[in-house]
Amino acid sequence: MGIKHCCYILYFTLALVTLLQPVRSAEDLQQILPSANETRSLTTCGTYNIIDGCWRGKADWAENRKALADCAQGFAKGTIGGKDGDIYTVTSELDDDVANPKEGTLRFGAAQNRPLWIIFARDMVIRLDRELAINNDKTIDGRGAKVEIINAGFAIYNVKNIIIHNIIMHDIVVNPGGLIKSHDGPPVPRKGSDGDAIGISGGSQIWIDHCSLSKAVDGLIDAKHGSTHFTVSNCLFTQHQYLLLFWDFDERGMLCTVAFNKFTDNVDQRMPNLRHGFVQVVNNNYERWGSYALGGSAGPTILSQGNRFLASDIKKEVVGRYGESAMSESINWNWRSYMDVFENGAIFVPSGVDPVLTPEQNAGMIPAEPGEAVLRLTSSAGVLSCQPGAPC
């Protein structure tokens, strides 16, 4: 039996154990973390983390693109994007008619009412004239080309089942509203965008993987207004102040995963910042944040597991607690650290207790490796260079 096969069996076993546990006590919570023997077995899988190990290393990826749809982990697990639809190829960089886009443009494909797996014919720099409204059941797959999105970002509003993979987004600015194509019917009026690279509002089953994001006027990824069940994984975040803002305006139970990402090169805060909700922050690499790395308000649950925190010479504190009740109530917020690695004097001040997880929370947890493994697990964060006929 091959090493790779053994790794899959190990991960499946860990996931099965997770699913069979209805709730976790403080002691039970440690069971999502592998034992020393399990860690040694995981390490033999090579450089791939659990997500990349599902599809990378295969030379036929271009002929079998939709295999990626079986690889989502965390709270986006089960997200298949456009797997059940046709392949749609973007052949034009133009975005000169946002109300009635031409077939062959990214906007035309993203707006269709049917499932689509969207790919790109060649390297492209697409200057979006207005934010791009993405309809249900879409995969935007940049593998095999260098695809850059500039000027306006992606809008994932009140839709579900979306995969964004291997896309570069940078220099995103505020744009006016107007009549914009968002589905098969006539264009609809949309308000202006606030400068997010990826904005999620009321969306669910969203997976953002292997993207490189930098330099937006507002957030790199913002999720609000009832958004839930999304995973941000294997991404590279650089040169930005406000990175990931995950805000629920009531206690409906936002569930999100931040896994295997790298935050470096002049990043300041919100990696993520969570209001209400529950986030697993697992096996990420944080390097020299400005204000803080992990933050939140209004009593969110933050489980930090197996991350690497390399502090700058100026700012050492990993977490930031905010809001009117932060001083009086934050001592009860469940912000916990397990197997994290702290370098150059980095400090994580925990609060609350080890939470008892619901069955739904249990099902979305990714088994964490120790923080010492993070450099390996995040070594390919950001867009990949993928050529047909060779492994990515």
UniProtKB/Swiss-Prot annotation:
Its cofactor is Ca(2+). Keywords: Allergen, Calcium, Disulfide bond, Glycoprotein, Lyase, Metal-binding, Signal. Belongs to the polysaccharide lyase 1 family. Amb a subfamily. It comes from Ambrosia artemisiifolia. It catalyses: Eliminative cleavage of (1->4)-alpha-D-galacturonan to give oligosaccharides with 4-deoxy-alpha-D-galact-4-enuronosyl groups at their non-reducing ends. Monomer. This is Pectate lyase 3. Has pectate lyase activity. Binds 1 Ca(2+) ion. One of its GO terms (biological process) is pectin catabolic process. InterPro entries: AmbAllergen, Pec_lyase, Pectin_lyas_fold, Pectin_lyase_fold/virulence, PEL. It comes from the Eukaryota. The N-terminus is blocked. The active site is at R270. Its EC number is 4.2.2.2. Gene3D superfamilies: Single-stranded right-handed beta-helix, Pectin lyase-like.
